């Protein structure tokens, strides 16, 4: 990097900080923190645990955003000051240090951009993910299990917790169906980018002829809804089946006659839960999953109407990403239009860059 490239990058980063400031509105956030402080000083505030917990969550989110914003702004100014000083003194060693540091600064500001983007009320929620293999038997069942492992590893990298809700093993390999809850900071905000059809192209390990196969699996992501969100479901619209828990879902899946599957007849949505020995608790969780999916479907519908999208682009039914393992190696996302060659890393859960590129592309599309 030379002085010209540095100054161009600094201009770009300054513009980003200005844009972030206009969206974040730090003064308003500081004012809201003072309001929360006044609320906390009232004894009545703590008498309502539900409300106080909600406000505490809001406070922590504000503090996190302000801290990241201040850190980025200060680091940018410090870097510029150091560059000016090193330039005046013609200190090559310090200049190289400044050029290296500005790359780290780029990453800090990108993280802040993503944080600001995840400001929708649902982004902070936990995420419920369901993976359904497409047609193709063992091939697609195996592909579903590869995706499942990818998300488990991604959650692990981000420090999120995972709770398996429903797991049906494939007859020969892989999985027929899996649903799991991801708990963590902005879990839905990040994972909503995974909603859609995922396509795999590879030489099949199950084909003795070594032929190339294409497999599909759909990933559905819904925010775990709070109890205070009202979703009306007519009992006549659902069918409830009870069965014995099955599959290799790990130690969290029990083996008693308590697994519950609920079918929502008008939409065809099917949800299941088999984590608890209590049929009653599994039914409650399955109903929560159904409500979350109906809520997500309604959000998609409203978004599509606002953007004037045709009906066939709504919901979970469109292809979003291809993973090609043969004849070359590449992951290509249809929304960001970006391609990545580090396929093994991505399938091992290194998804941050891929997801962030999607979030940025979608934000630019909105604007």
UniProtKB/Swiss-Prot annotation:
UniProt keyword Hydrolase present: no
Residues bearing PTM N5-methylglutamine: 251
Entry's Gene Ontology molecular function annotations: translation release factor activity, codon specific
InterPro entries, per database record: PCRF, Pep_chain_release_fac_I, Pep_chain_release_fac_I_sf, PrfB
Main location: cytoplasm
Compartmental location: Cytoplasm
Pfam annotation, one family: PCRF
Listed SMART domains: PCRF (SM00937)
Keywords, ordered alphabetically: Cytoplasm, Methylation, Protein biosynthesis
Superkingdom of origin: Bacteria
Coiled-coil boundaries: none
Protein name as catalogued: Peptide chain release factor 2
Record function comment: Peptide chain release factor 2 directs the termination of translation in response to the peptide chain termination codons UGA and UAA.
Family: Belongs to the prokaryotic/mitochondrial release factor family.
Gene name for this UniProt entry: prfB
GO cellular component: cytoplasm
Post-translational modification comment from the UniProt entry: Methylated by PrmC. Methylation increases the termination efficiency of RF2.
């Amino acid at each position: 990097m030379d002085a010209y490239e540095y100054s161009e990058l600094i201009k770009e980063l300054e513009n980003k900080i200005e844009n972030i400031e206009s969206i974040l509105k730090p003064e308003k956030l500081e004012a809201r923190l003072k309001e929360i402080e006044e609320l906390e000083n009232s004894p009545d505030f703590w008498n309502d645990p539900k409300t106080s917990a909600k406000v505490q969550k809001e406070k922590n989110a504000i503090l996190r955003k302000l801290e990241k914003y201040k850190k980025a702004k200060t680091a940018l100014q410090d870097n510029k000051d150091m560059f000016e000083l090193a330039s005046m003194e013609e200190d090559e060693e310090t200049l190289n240090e400044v050029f290296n540091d500005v790359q780290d600064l780029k990453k800090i500001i990108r993280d802040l951009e993503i944080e600001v983007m995840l400001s929708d009320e649902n982004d902070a929620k936990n995420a419920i993910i369901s993976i359904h293999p497409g047609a193709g038997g063992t091939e697609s069942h195996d592909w579903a299990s590869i995706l499942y492992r990818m998300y488990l590893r991604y959650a692990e990298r981000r420090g999120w917790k995972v709770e398996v809700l429903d797991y049906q093993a494939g007859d020969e390999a892989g999985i027929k169906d899996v649903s799991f809850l991801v708990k963590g900071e902005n879990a839905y905000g990040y994972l909503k980018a995974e909603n859609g059809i995922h396509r795999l192209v590879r030489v099949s390990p199950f084909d003795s002829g070594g032929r190339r196969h294409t497999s599909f699996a759909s990933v559905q992501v819904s925010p775990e809804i709070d109890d205070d969100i009202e979703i009306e479901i007519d009992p006549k619209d659902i069918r409830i089946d009870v069965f014995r828990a099955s599959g290799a879902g790990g130690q969290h899946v029990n083996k008693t006659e308590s697994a519950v599957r609920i079918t929502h007849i008008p939409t065809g949505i099917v949800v299941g839960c088999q984590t608890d020995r209590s049929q009653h608790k599994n039914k409650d969780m399955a109903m929560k999953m159904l409500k979350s999916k109906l809520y997500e479907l309604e959000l998609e519908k409203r978004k599509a109407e606002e953007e004037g999208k045709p009906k066939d682009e709504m919901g979970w039914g469109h292809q979003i990403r291809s993973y090609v393992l043969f004849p070359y190696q590449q992951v290509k996302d249809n929304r960001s239009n970006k391609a990545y060659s580090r396929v093994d890393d991505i399938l091992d859960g290194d998804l941050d860059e891929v997801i962030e590129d999607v979030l940025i592309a979608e934000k630019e599309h909105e604007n």
